[in-house]
């Protein structure tokens, strides 16, 4: 049998939704994805589309 993998499921949250009050609709945009914790030891930051802000924003990994 294979060893338990190094891949974990993480949540990415929009950084502008927390501070921006003038947005399209209320709430915070969240995406889930996986990462290999051996190769990517730090927190991930990706630019993804936020439907609440209606634009591409930086999404940071949450704990």
From Swiss-Prot:
HAMAP family documented for this protein: Ribosomal_bL33
Top-level taxon: Bacteria
Gene3D superfamilies: Ribosomal protein L33 (2.20.28.120)
One of the record's GO molecular function terms: structural constituent of ribosome
GO biological process, one term: translation
Lineage: Bacteria, Bacillati, Cyanobacteriota, Cyanophyceae, Gloeobacterales
Cellular component GO terms, alphabetical: cytoplasm; ribonucleoprotein complex; ribosome
Pfam families per UniProt: Ribosomal_L33 (PF00471)
InterPro entries: Ribosomal_bL33, Ribosomal_bL33_CS, Ribosomal_bL33_sf, Ribosomal_zn-bd
Protein name stated in the entry: Large ribosomal subunit protein bL33
Family the entry assigns: Belongs to the bacterial ribosomal protein bL33 family.
Keywords annotated in UniProt: Ribonucleoprotein, Ribosomal protein
């Amino acid at each position: 049998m294979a060893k338990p993998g190094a891949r974990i499921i993480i949540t990415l949250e929009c950084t502008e939704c927390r501070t921006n009050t003038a947005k399209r609709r209320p709430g915070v945009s969240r995406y889930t994805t996986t990462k290999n914790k051996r190769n990517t030891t730090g927190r991930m930051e990706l630019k993804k589309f936020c439907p609440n802000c209606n634009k591409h924003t930086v999404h940071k990994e949450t704990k």
